[in-house]
Amino acid sequence: MHPDQKKTFKEKNDIRKKLFNSTKEERLDWRKMKDEKKRKNEEKIIKEAEEAKKAKIEKVDHTPPFTISIAVPGQFLNNAQSAELRTYMAGQIARAATLYRVDEIIIYDESCRMTDEAVNAYYNGTWQGNLIPAETNYEGCFYLAKILEYLECPQYLRKDLFPIQKPLKNAGLLNPLDAQHHLKYDEKTLRFREGVVLKKRSKDGRGPICNIGLEKEFEIDSDAVQLPPYTRVTVEIKNLTEQCKLYRGSITSGATVTRETGLYWGYSVRLMTGLQKVLQAKKFDIVAGVSPRGKLASQMDVCILNKPKILLVFGGVAGVDAAVESEELAEWRRAEDAFDVLIRTTSLSNGSRSERVEENVLSVLAQVQCHLETLNAL
């Protein structure tokens, strides 16, 4: 017999002798210990099964089967008859983008006068928005970008992220987006939230402190994450239901939230100096121009199995053809050559002699998404 087997046999034999020679009270204690051990084993098995089930659920990919982005010229705001109407037109774009889960809104300069230096000035905060959008400038692009960014941002972050500026003067009159990532003060059903890094010193070995719109502040787990104050972040809270001084967790991304929960986590805004830059990005599987000469949106050929990324390009008041023709240095001269496909919204002629960009965006998004959802259901 192997020495280990002898040892095991001896231990078991000693336990038996002790049990048989024990009193009635001692035997009852042994029985309680045995029942307690059995109960703990059962609890352990149940807990492991629940954790395995939870992990399986979390691994399900809820990413949508397709992604839609749009490109619009900022100059369409020049037609607004007042500052209030200008803000309202931008708000219509934001509402349409949120309703139909647009991933990105690209704002391009239809006149091709915008420079990279002007775009950099907008992003580094030196642009103030003091000029009124007009045909002689490209301020409409910056106005549109600022209003779209403001509306997409959760209300509790706006005070820290958006200083008082002329483009936002009438933003309070707009209908709220009420997007799925615009969580309320007392809403604790979701472990993900948007936050902003505060100008506060954290303890050694711990990360920055953030405002996430709850009654307590949020602390990032790791001090390896170095973020400047007033940086917007998406966070995952690890101790949401616990009684603690601060919420704690890690930084994540909107794409991760969508993949794990299926929720729409807002759109991003990007400025481009011209339509040519938009088309040269090669970021999308299908680039569709919106034109009255195109085919119906329901006839657009799409392979839904590849989770396509689709860009819908809208023109200004003169249409997408005028935007293409204004690109003097481009290798194409016609809209048919610039885009993979041209689409329109209806087989009938419009009842109105003019098309407004904000109305066109809403109708095209509705029809394209309906077409893609139909293909996905097949």
Curated annotation (Swiss-Prot):
Q: What is its EC number?
A: 2.1.1.-
Q: Which GO terms describe its cellular component?
A: centrosome; cytoplasm; kinetochore; spindle
Cross-referenced Gene3D superfamilies, in alphabetical order? 3.40.1280.10, Nucleic acid-binding proteins (2.40.50.140)
Q: Where are the transmembrane segments?
A: none
Tell me where on the tree of life, at the top rank, the source sits.
Answer: Eukaryota
Would you kindly state one Gene Ontology biological process term found in this protein's UniProt entry?
methylation
Name of the encoding gene: spot-1
- The name of this protein is Putative methyltransferase spot-1
Localization terms from the record:
Cytoplasm, Cytoskeleton, Spindle; Chromosome, Centromere, Kinetochore; Cytoplasm, Cytoskeleton, Microtubule organizing center, Centrosome
What is the species listed in this Swiss-Prot or TrEMBL entry?
Caenorhabditis elegans
